[in-house]
Amino acid sequence: MQIFGKILGAFFGFLFGGVFGALFGLFIGHQFDKARRLSQAGFKTAGFGQGPSQAQRQEEFFKSAFAVMGHVAKAKGQVTKEEIQLASAMMDRMSLHGEQRRAAQDAFREGKERDFPLEQLLERVKIATSGRFDLLQFFLELQISAAFADGDVHPSERNVLHKIARGLGFSSEQLERRLQMQEAAFRFQRQGGFGGQQHQSHHSSSHGGWQQASQTDRLADAYKILGIDANADGKEVKRAYRKLMNEHHPDKLMAKGLPPEMMNMAKEKSQEIQSAYDLIKKEKGFK
């Protein structure tokens, strides 16, 4: 944590202006520390005390997402065909073409480098998102999706995901919960559970895939997608649903700095939550 500017500002402020001078000096010192931190992270600012622009934040989030995705894919030593297909499919879902697609591909390749600076990049992501929980959560969920590309999460990938989660400010328990939710979501997706549509799976059928599940299994996965127990009552179900929809609302994420290219993926996530909720609601018989 950089506090040199705060200490120096408070000291000289108190020296020349007493308590009020110290407070003013503390504020000036804080702005100095902030500018220094941004500069060290590689961001250009418009002026003293100002952070990166919205466009800079979105570009950083976009490139970092694909770079870290490449790092996750490389975790077990070799990037599989399924992982490359998943990255390509994500680019398709974002409607990336031309320069944008090349930027995403370059970032993905960068993430596969042996000396990839993961911790530094995660620090840049935190700065780019201003530490907003829902944006950081969306970033983490993208990486979890990448880890599930070939149907299962390898121990090496899990270790990298724990590093990513810690770097973004999430606990191991929070990561494990999201891993369970994502695994359930993939099973639900294969059954055409999102709005009744059968989405193309990125998992290879040669790996066995997920077997066609019974209605009971689909319902169990719906509960896991919402992060609740099967014995949850109507109030608990609604509370979990509203919380997740609030955190993943595409328009809210866009307003907070989500790159516009990722809007479709945010919509898919909210549709996933909605479909799981609708199934539970139908089963429990409440409106």
From Swiss-Prot:
Top-level lineage group: Bacteria
Cytoplasmic topological domain residue ranges: 31-287
Periplasmic compartment spans: 1-6
GO cellular component: plasma membrane
Gene Ontology molecular function, alphabetical: protein-folding chaperone binding
Region Disordered, residue ranges: 192-213
Annotated localization: Cell inner membrane
Keywords: Cell inner membrane, Cell membrane, Chaperone, Membrane, Transmembrane, Transmembrane helix
Residues annotated as domain J: 221-287
Membrane topology classification: Single-pass type III membrane protein
PANTHER family cross-referenced by the UniProt entry: CO-CHAPERONE PROTEIN DJLA
Role description: Regulatory DnaK co-chaperone. Direct interaction between DnaK and DjlA is needed for the induction of the wcaABCDE operon, involved in the synthesis of a colanic acid polysaccharide capsule, possibly through activation of the RcsB/RcsC phosphotransfer signaling pathway. The colanic acid capsule may help the bacterium survive conditions outside the host.
Protein name stated in the entry: Co-chaperone protein DjlA
Lineage of the species this protein comes from: Bacteria, Pseudomonadati, Pseudomonadota, Gammaproteobacteria, Vibrionales
